[in-house]
Amino acid sequence: MKKLALFALLMVPAILLASGHDSGEASRYLTQTGRESDFWPRVINFTIFAAILYYLIANPIKNFFKGRREGIAGQLKEIESKLQAAKDEKKEAQSHLNESVNKAAEIIEDAKKEAEILAAKIAEASENELVVLEKQFEEKITLEERKAARDVIDEVLSENITTDDIALDETKVVDIISRKAEHGKVA
């Protein structure tokens, strides 16, 4: 591209100078310089101008584009580092999410086990309480049976024993109790 631009800069003035002029102007130049055309001096002047222009502008233009390239490279690196940081954060968040899901599953499983243990303890306590209540009920029944038997014995003894019967022997007491039992008063 550079070579094409330099070639165009050299050829355009040559083409312009090659166009025809009035003969009066050409003769005047010939008398002043001793040459028929000023093509070569103009080429030399243009070359000097282009060289000076290149000398003055080339480094600032190179520096500008170099700075621009470095700026773009820096921005690209910054964007890549941000992208990598975002990917790392995403991975970390994903690992935290997986860890939380695992922990939640573990908590749920522990809660189920704890519920089973509590249910078993409650069932066991209920069974123990039922056993105790049944035992108390049986003891109360036994106590009531004894109490009823005592009441019946007291009643039988108080009704059937008179002052004449104070001298009772064992056979007589058994006979009285068996009579009462036959009538259905002893449970």
From Swiss-Prot:
InterPro entries in the cross-refs: ATP_synth_b/b'su_bac/chlpt (IPR002146), ATP_synthase_B_chain (IPR050059)
Membrane protein topology class: Single-pass membrane protein
Annotated keywords: ATP synthesis, Cell inner membrane, Cell membrane, CF(0), Hydrogen ion transport, Ion transport, Membrane, Transmembrane, Transmembrane helix, Transport
GO molecular function, a single term: proton-transporting ATP synthase activity, rotational mechanism
Compartments (UniProt record): Cell inner membrane
Job description of the protein: F(1)F(0) ATP synthase produces ATP from ADP in the presence of a proton or sodium gradient. F-type ATPases consist of two structural domains, F(1) containing the extramembraneous catalytic core and F(0) containing the membrane proton channel, linked together by a central stalk and a peripheral stalk. During catalysis, ATP synthesis in the catalytic domain of F(1) is coupled via a rotary mechanism of the central stalk subunits to proton translocation.
HAMAP family, A to Z: ATP_synth_b_bprime
PANTHER family: ATP SYNTHASE SUBUNIT B', CHLOROPLASTIC
Protein name: ATP synthase subunit b
